[in-house]
Curated annotation (Swiss-Prot):
Source organism of the structure: Erythroxylum coca (Coca plant)
Record carries keyword Oxidoreductase: yes
Residue sites binding substrate per the record: S150
InterPro entries: NAD(P)-bd_dom_sf, SDR_fam
Protein's name according to its UniProt entry: Tropinone reductase-like 1
EC number: 1.1.1.-
Keyword Oxidoreductase: yes
Length: 272
């Protein structure tokens, strides 16, 4: 039986790009990947945060400015990474934006400009990241491409329409890439989180604990609150060799929320 590497060796020798890596899920993942031995390239448009994180992590990390909606930026990101480290093993397409505070909005009140903006970043950025990572990984005959999607791809009514459309597209893209890239030993997977508070949520620090408590109360897994580290740990597993035969999945990290419809049970209990 093949031995499993120790907890700090799971990505030893690997090179990872994390888009949206300067804050939130991306920053947490960058730290965890670094702790587990990877050379980490933090890609973002938040230059001060990204550079500060790279400096904190030290010599095996660097920051590259990248607007994922611009193909030239993504080409530069991948080419600079390969020039610096000689390879690319993990492409985590995590960068994303939301409408307002991410709450559902009537389609009548939705703006086409919001749809264009979210599709350009959330779906277009994922497409470009996968495209240019594949250029390198095909030559290596191995690699891992990850995407951050959303629980709104599994349950309707949790977000604005533009966001749901963009993230559903990400899941479709990942699924469609799986058979093509599998021929080259490249694994492709999505991660779809339940609600959590990150920088893109536009929620003030004063309201952060209140919103986290509400999400925890509404969740199915009692006593637990999903935070960025929960998604980072899912990404670590999928990026590691432990997941060598895992490809084409949408890993839903929601504490079981999406498999439960409490309305019938609530109606029954209310009558008892």
């Amino acid at each position: 039986m093949t031995s499993i590497a120790g907890p700090h060796k799971r990505l030893e020798g690997k090179v990872a790009i994390i888009t949206g890596g300067a804050s939130g899920i991306g920053a947490c993942t960058a730290e965890l990947f670094h702790e587990n031995g990877a050379k980490v390239v933090i890609a973002d448009i938040q230059d001060d945060l990204g550079q500060a994180l790279a400096t904190k992590l030290g010599g095996k990390a660097c920051y590259i400015h990248c607007d994922v909606s611009k193909e030239d930026d993504v080409i530069n990101l991948v080419d600079t990474t390969v020039a610096k480290y000689g390879r690319l093993d993990i492409m985590f397409n995590n960068a994303g934006i939301i409408e307002g505070q991410g709450l559902p909005v009537s389609v009548v009140e939705s703006e086409k400009s919001d749809l264009d903006r979210l599709l350009s970043v959330n779906l277009g950025g994922a497409f470009l990241g996968a495209k240019h990572a594949t250029r390198v990984m095909v030559q290596q005959r191995k690699g891992c491409i990850l995407f951050t999607s959303s629980l709104c791809t599994s349950i309707a009514g949790l977000s604005g329409h533009a966001y749901a459309a963009s993230k559903s597209g990400v899941c479709g893209l990942a699924k469609n890439l799986t058979p093509e890239l599998g021929k080259y030993g490249i694994r492709v997977n999505c991660i779809s989180p339940y609600g959590l508070v990150t920088g893109i949520s536009n929620i003030s620090e004063a309201n952060r604990e209140l919103v986290e408590a509400m999400l925890s109360e509404l969740g199915t897994l009692s006593g637990q609150t999903l935070r960025a580290d929960g998604i980072a740990k899912a990404a670590l597993f999928l990026a590691s060799d432990e997941a060598y035969y895992v490809s084409g999945i949408n890993m839903v990290v929601d504490g079981g929320y999406s498999v439960v419809n409490p309305r019938l049970a609530d109606a029954i209990y209310s009558k008892l």
